[in-house]
UniProtKB/Swiss-Prot annotation:
Residues 194-249 are annotated as: Disordered. This is Multiple RNA-binding domain-containing protein 1. Gene3D superfamilies: 3.30.70.330. PROSITE patterns: RRM (PS50102). It comes from Candida albicans (strain SC5314 / ATCC MYA-2876). Belongs to the RRM MRD1 family. Keywords: Nucleus, Repeat, Ribonucleoprotein, RNA-binding, rRNA processing. Residues 2-79, 310-388, 493-565, 617-700, 717-794 form the RRM domain. Its main location: nucleus. One of its GO terms (biological process) is endonucleolytic cleavage in ITS1 to separate SSU-rRNA from 5.8S rRNA and LSU-rRNA from tricistronic rRNA transcript (SSU-rRNA, 5.8S rRNA, LSU-rRNA). It is found in: Nucleus. One of its GO terms (molecular function) is RNA binding.
Length: 841
């Protein structure tokens, strides 16, 4: 917890005074003094610290202390999600209003249900009464009953005898009684039907229509009482006329179609189509369904939108926070695609908000639910859903219409920021290297490289090694840590610019990159083969990288690579940001040079350390700060003579597996007892990270191998060269490595067809010569391939050691083959023996 609440403050205290008062124990990121509506102080405030350790120290230091004459109480602040936080008066009133509203809605719903039930019962009874009072309607309802509700053996009469002729009426009709209510026309119809033939069918139809017209009209009038909608007379007439035309055999299909079609003039208006009118019951049901759906709470609406985009908008962040701080915070919930802090382009400072894009949308939802309104670096994070990022890239449909060369160029640009380059960080254009060396020697490039000479490739490799050495020396003098190039983590603010033509000036590079933001540092060695650009802020550097990657520049194409983290060991000087070539050339005369061995960790002292034989003298260092690292302790004792190594004792962290905690003490080893006593007299009582150190001689002796044995263990006078061109010969290796010392042997293994296998072994007489060759030829290209060099194992001194080594090697090869076979067959896994063994002898 990095946020505190301070109670009992004086009324006249302001936020500026609070910030000044509480900054004694750490960096204060936020000060919030609570006030009333009239601006009067409520005598409590919230203080935010950048780290939880600083907040903890502040609680111990300031709690129950005094500000002027007021005694203050300092405690850790609670988050909104803490169940122990009491509700405010506003929140209580809001909940009571919501409860009352829910109760009113429940009562209203019950009333509506009762009315609907009553209305349904009333309408059912009205229909039953109407059927009982109307014989014709009752007969119709009986006839229209489904077959499973009608008894097939029952008489076709109405239950109460009404609605049909009685037995007396039928007898009178058969006897020809004129008083019968049955119309004579009905009898004529029956007789006609019995004696009719097929030719007289039309007459019978006309006769039946005459008797049926009045009945249909009466039935329609009776059915109107059910509330049916009135029919459209015009549509009825049109349908009847269409049916008559269809029944007429003399009308063709085309004439019938014309009669059913409507002609529209060329410039006439299209008649509006009347939408279908829904039933009243259907509309009511749809309305009821929408009312029954539960409304989403504001939190659920935010989570639903986050699930659609997978992007978060976080505000109220600390202005000193970096993208790496939030990357480590949000990466706990899933893989991140982008973390972007909004930067003010005029000042280069944060605007106080950022965007986080997750690869998986569900991870963004989990991060929102976990971190919203939580404390980070002393501030309450407010997380909202962000709109989807605008993508201006071309899709596959647009790309396929472009030429193939343009498609590849655009795809390279899109993948530039994600691709890990295969070349080394100090890659240089071979043509620029030769131009630089030729210019330095005062000869032409053709004179330097003779195309008819078989050793031209070796000369080019040696020239590249010379230029790389000069570049290393230049960068080391400017505070560049070359060992950081081996790190995997990259810094978005640093860009390595490569492959530009020889003769390019620092002004041209600066003008090219300054269009995307303010530059903090520019370095380009006199060889003019590579440059390092550092931007003031990361967004500007990302924009420049995406726009300039693989961009054609003069006669070449720019290769850009993001620089490693912690590349620079110091802040830039005024000369390092200058763009005038004269200042660049005179830089080395102004600045104090730093030894290359110091940057690489191979200083003269290290050479002396390697020569230490036997036990060393250890100094016990007590009362270390738990935050003090080995590097900080080493930096303190390194200037003293005889320093060997410094260590801080640690123990496993029970809360975080894989991490360690400092035990508050350590040891520093020196070569002699006199040098250890000098260190004690010099630094005893020195304050490091806020703690006063206590030094005394340790009763145990140092091993003397903690620093030197690590360096010596992997070194030998034999080097293995990998990624060797197949065209390279033994003569080329003799010329290349012979420039750095006397060679003992050079071996290039070959296949059965006498072709090279792509690696070789070179052995020097002295280990120092092998180290020189390794350092000078690192990153050098031979025939277009970068040489990868490692120290090889020394040859066995006797046959038994050689047999044991070969046995281990064969076991490893057999285990590898078994593992491959098991994977293909799907039988499982075979664990390899994890031992420190070399692939090559």
């Amino acid at each position: 917890m990095s946020r505190l609440i301070v109670k009992g403050l004086p009324k006249y205290y302001t936020e500026e005074k609070l910030r000044e008062f509480f900054s004694k124990q750490g960096d204060v990121t936020d000060v919030k003094l609570m006030k009333k509506r009239n601006g009067e102080s409520r005598k409590f405030a919230f203080i935010g610290y950048k780290s939880a350790d600083a907040a903890e120290r502040a609680v111990k230091y300031f709690n129950k202390s005094f500000i002027d004459t007021a005694r203050i109480e300092v405690e850790f602040a609670k988050t909104f999600s803490d169940p122990t936080v009491p509700l405010s008066f506003k929140e209580k009133r809001k909940r009571e209003e919501q409860k009352l509203k829910d109760e009113q809605e429940r009562l209203l719903e019950q009333e509506l249900r009762a009315q609907a039930k009553k209305q349904k019962t009333k309408s059912t009874s009205e229909i039953d009464d109407e059927i009982a009072s109307n014989p014709k309607l009752r007969e119709y309802m009986e006839v229209m009953k489904p077959s499973h509700q009608v008894k097939s053996w029952a008489n076709d009469t109405i239950a109460d005898g009404s609605g049909g002729p009685s037995v007396q009426d039928l007898e009178n009709a058969l006897n020809g009684n004129n008083e019968s209510p049955v119309d004579k026309s009905n009898i004529e119809v029956v007789n006609t039907v019995e004696d009719a033939s097929d030719d007289e069918y039309n007459d019978f139809k006309e006769l039946s229509n005459k008797h049926g017209e009045n009945e249909d009209e009466e039935e329609e009038e009776e059915m109107m009482s059910l509330g049916d909608l009135p029919t459209n007379e015009e549509n009825k007439d049109k349908n009847e006329s269409g049916e008559n035309l269809a029944a007429n055999e003399n009308i063709s299909d085309l004439e019938w179609l014309k009669s059913r079609s409507t002609r529209i003039k060329e410039n006439g208006e299209v008649p509006e189509i009347v939408p279908e009118v829904k039933e009243v019951n259907e509309v009511t049901e749809a309305t009821q369904q929408s009312d029954n759906e539960p409304e989403m709470t504001p939190e659920e609406q935010i989570a639903h939108k986050i699930e659609e985009t997978g992007r978060l908008f976080i505000r109220n962040i600390s202005y000193e926070a970096s993208e790496e701080d939030f990357r480590s915070l949000f990466s706990q919930y899933g893989a991140l695609e982008e973390v972007h802090i909004a930067i003010d382009t005029r000042t280069g400072k944060s605007k106080g908000f950022l965007y986080v894009q997750f690869l998986k949308k569900e991870d963004a939802t989990r991060a929102y639910r976990s971190l919203d309104k939580q404390i980070f670096q002393g501030r309450l994070l407010h997380i909202l859903p962000a709109d989807k990022k605008k993508d201006h890239r071309l899709d596959e449909f647009d790309l396929k219409n472009l030429p193939l060369k343009k498609q590849r160029e655009l795809k390279k640009k899109a993948q530039a920021a994600k691709t890990q380059f295969s070349w080394n960080s100090l890659y240089m254009n071979s043509d620029a290297v030769l131009e630089s060396v030729a210019s330095k020697l005062g000869v032409t490039k053709s004179q330097l490289i003779d195309p008819e000479n078989s050793s031209s490739a070796v000369k080019q490799a040696l020239a590249e090694a010379h230029v790389i050495g000069d570049v290393r020396k230049y960068f080391e003098d400017r505070g560049v840590d070359l060992t950081s190039f081996d790190k995997k983590e990259r810094d978005d603010k640093i860009i390595l610019v490569k492959n530009f033509p020889f003769g390019t000036t620092i002004d041209e590079i600066g003008e090219l990159f300054s269009a995307y933001g303010q530059l903090k540092r520019m370095l380009m060695p006199p060889a003019g083969t590579i440059a390092i650009i550092e931007f003031r802020d990361a967004p500007s550097a990302r924009a420049a990288f995406s726009k300039l990657a693989y961009k054609r520049f003069k006669s070449s194409i720019l290769y850009l690579e993001k620089g490693p983290k912690d590349l620079f060991t110091r802040e830039p000087t005024t000369n390092e940001v200058a763009t005038i070539p004269e200042q660049q050339q005179n830089e080395h005369a102004v600045e104090a040079k730093i030894s290359a061995n110091e940057i690489l960790g191979e200083s003269k002292e290290d050479d002396e350390i390697e020569s230490v034989q036997g036990p060393t003298v250890a100094v016990f260092v007590k009362n270390l700060n738990f935050a003090t690292t080995v590097q900080a302790l080493s930096d303190l004792f390194k200037p003293l003579p005889g320093f060997v190594v410094a260590t801080v004792k640690t123990k496993p962290d029970p809360k975080n597996s894989g991490k360690t905690l400092s035990m508050g003490f350590g040891f520093v080893e020196f070569r002699t007892k006199e040098q250890a006593n000098v260190a004690i007299s010099t630094l005893d009582g020195h304050v490091l990270d806020g703690h006063k150190l206590q030094l005394k001689l340790s009763h145990k002796q140092g091993t003397g191998t903690s620093a030197s044995s690590i360096k010596k263990s992997g070194k030998s006078s034999k080097i293995i060269i990998k990624n060797l061109p197949f065209e390279a010969t033994r003569k080329d290796l003799l010329e290349l490595f012979g420039a750095f010392g006397q060679l003992k042997s050079v071996r290039v293994p070959k296949k059965f067809d006498q072709s090279a296998r792509g690696f070789a072994f070179v052995e020097f007489n002295l280990m120092k010569e092998a180290e020189t060759a390794m350092s000078q030829l690192e990153g050098v290209h031979l025939l277009g391939r970068r040489l990868v060099m490692q120290y090889a194992e020394q040859d066995a001194e006797n046959a038994e050691v050689e047999i044991e080594r070969m046995t281990k090697k064969v076991k490893k090869q057999v285990a590898t083959q078994n593992l491959a076979a098991a994977r293909l067959a799907g039988k499982g896994k075979i664990e390899l023996e994890e031992k420190d063994e070399e692939d090559f002898d």
